């Protein structure tokens, strides 16, 4: 296990199993409600589904999933495997979710006590949705920023992060630049989580 990536370990295999199992399962459709109290879900574009936070202070909180090109929210089972391995208590952790999308990964970290979580997203509609969610949860540790995830990592103070979360669009050229930038931003003993369409060999990371 290196400080720069979760690789060459049982957790990698377990996450891949969870990803494979979840791939066939569609995101749960949003139930129709006349008086929706969940403003974040109500703010989601037509056709949106939802996923849920699975641990911590916001356990079972619904997160909207908009029908946006390339948006792939990390399924519950995958997040459960990841965060069970990282630990239920992330108190004091500094985290950056570089391609936040629905915010599922970063909000999960904040729910488990992370001291600071920066959600970076380039899609304006998703940024607005994340801002509504942050306000609804009164998540003072969470900051939402519109922009490029790789640039955000490059701008981070070197060795300042305990957890870097990378789930970039699979059809974009983001993997190597994000890993390189993340390796500079993550502290000794910290971790980078990468979701990718293929397995990466150790020498590539």
Model-assigned labels for residue ranges:
Residues 1-205:
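Class I S-adenosyl-L-methionine-dependent methyltransferase catalytic core
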């Amino acid at each position: 296990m290196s400080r720069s990536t979760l690789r060459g370990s049982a957790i990698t295999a377990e996450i891949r199993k969870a990803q494979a199992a979840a791939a066939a399962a569609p995101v749960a459709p949003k139930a129709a409600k006349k008086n929706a109290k969940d403003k974040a879900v109500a703010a989601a574009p037509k056709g949106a589904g939802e996923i849920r936070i699975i641990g911590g202070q916001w356990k079972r909180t619904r997160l909207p999933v908009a029908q946006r090109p390339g948006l792939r929210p990390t399924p519950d089972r995958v997040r459960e495997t990841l965060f069970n391995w990282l630990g239920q208590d992330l108190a004091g952790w500094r985290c950056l979710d570089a391609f936040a999308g629905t915010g599922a990964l970063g909000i999960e970290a904040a729910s488990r006590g992370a001291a600071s979580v920066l959600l970076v997203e380039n899609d304006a509609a998703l940024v607005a949705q994340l801002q509504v969610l942050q306000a609804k949860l009164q998540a003072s540790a969470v900051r939402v920023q519109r922009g490029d995830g790789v640039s955000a990592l490059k701008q981070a103070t070197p060795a300042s992060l305990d957890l870097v979360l990378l789930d970039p669009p699979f059809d974009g050229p983001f993997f190597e630049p994000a890993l390189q930038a993340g390796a500079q931003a993550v502290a000794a003993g910290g971790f980078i989580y990468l979701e990718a369409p293929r397995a990466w060999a150790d020498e590539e990371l």
